[in-house]
Amino acid sequence: MKVILKQDVSNLGKRFDVVDVKDGYAIHFLFPKKLAAPLTKKSLQDRDLFLKKQQEHYEINKALSHKLKEVIEQTELHFSLKEHNGRPYGSIITKQIINQAHTKGMALQKFMFKDNVRLGFGDHEITLHIFEDTTAVLKVKVTPDNGVK
């Protein structure tokens, strides 16, 4: 019996795969647990429609990620920290970078950063993982605060 998998099933296939299984396995295991549906014209059309929409979403996200990469690489964020005896008092963290990026119109998320970032004085380049194979380098400059002590 040919069925379309509704979920990933170990040793059988992934979601939306068309597989051939024994009748008893399909009737007594896959169908009651809603892991698969019988292969019909309608289920095949639904599968094709879903896969087409999924591909469209993928293409849109890929295009948006390339636009975001261009914006990120053209932007430099500036921060200032208080200093004590020439050393930074505190550090710049991921959350502060994300907040300032949002004010400049960049939609950064915490998962884009490889590690938690803690920056002291100087020029820094942070590699961001935006989408599958798309990475961007964000430039951050941290300077001493020139305010009155």
Swiss-Prot record:
Cross-referenced InterPro entries: Ribosomal_bL9 (IPR000244), Ribosomal_bL9/RNase_H1_N (IPR009027), Ribosomal_bL9_bac/chp (IPR020594), Ribosomal_bL9_C (IPR020069), Ribosomal_bL9_C_sf (IPR036791), Ribosomal_bL9_N (IPR020070), Ribosomal_bL9_N_sf (IPR036935)
GO biological process per UniProt: translation
UniProt KW Ribosomal protein keyword: yes
Keywords: Ribonucleoprotein, Ribosomal protein, RNA-binding, rRNA-binding
A GO cellular component annotation in the UniProt record: ribosome
GO MF annotations in UniProt: rRNA binding; structural constituent of ribosome
NCBIfam families: L9 (TIGR00158)
Cited PANTHER family: 50S RIBOSOMAL PROTEIN L9 (PTHR21368)
Family from the record: Belongs to the bacterial ribosomal protein bL9 family.
HAMAP family with a match to the protein in the record: Ribosomal_bL9
Described function: Binds to the 23S rRNA.
Protein name (record): Large ribosomal subunit protein bL9
Lineage: Bacteria, Bacillati, Mycoplasmatota, Mycoplasmoidales, Mycoplasmoidaceae
